[in-house]
């Protein structure tokens, strides 16, 4: 019964969320990546978000890395170990990392490694454990979106003060920050948007 429920939820999630999510996220990310240059997408998945950003800014050149490489990826991509990016310091102008950090045990280490490789900045999309029942809501969203897809689910969500403290700890700062993303259509937005997500540009302090 649980398996059937999960299958039904996956179908609903794909129809109502995924296509819109790619389009909306690409718009927010593209707005924070100014000009052209090289971009490394960390945790690139199937490359659909990078592809959607390219449709808005053809002056960018994307490459992807992930701990598990899918059979089809829309951008050139390679496997990495999830800890050390196989590139020299400042190898890329930008890094994008979308809904990856909360799947790691040490998000500060992962973000610091991204900052090492990025010349201009790291554009992060992740969650905020802010507000009523935020933890429960985020866990449910992660379970629906990722369970059964070989994705680690440590549910490592941070609040806004936690993120600010993390940035300070690794010698970084947020130069742009937005929580008004509009990822979900009504009525789902009332439960699943409500300040639970952010996109930010992180630079070395």
Regions found by a protein language model. Name each.
Residues 1-27:
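Class I SAM-dependent methyltransferase Rossmann-like catalytic core
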Residues 36-45:
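Conserved class I S-adenosyl-L-methionine
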Residues 46-84:
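Class I SAM-dependent methyltransferase SAM/SAH-binding core
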Residues 51, 127-189:
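C-terminal alpha-helical "lid/dimerization" subdomain adjacent to the S-adenosyl-L-methionine
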Residues 96:
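A conserved beta-strand element that flanks and buttresses the S-adenosyl-L-methionine
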Residues 99-100:
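Short catalytic micro-motifs in class I SAM-dependent methyltransferases
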Residues 104-113:
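A short, conserved alpha-helix within the catalytic core of class I
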Residues 120-127:
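Conserved beta-strand signature within the Rossmann-like core of class I S-adenosyl-L-methionine
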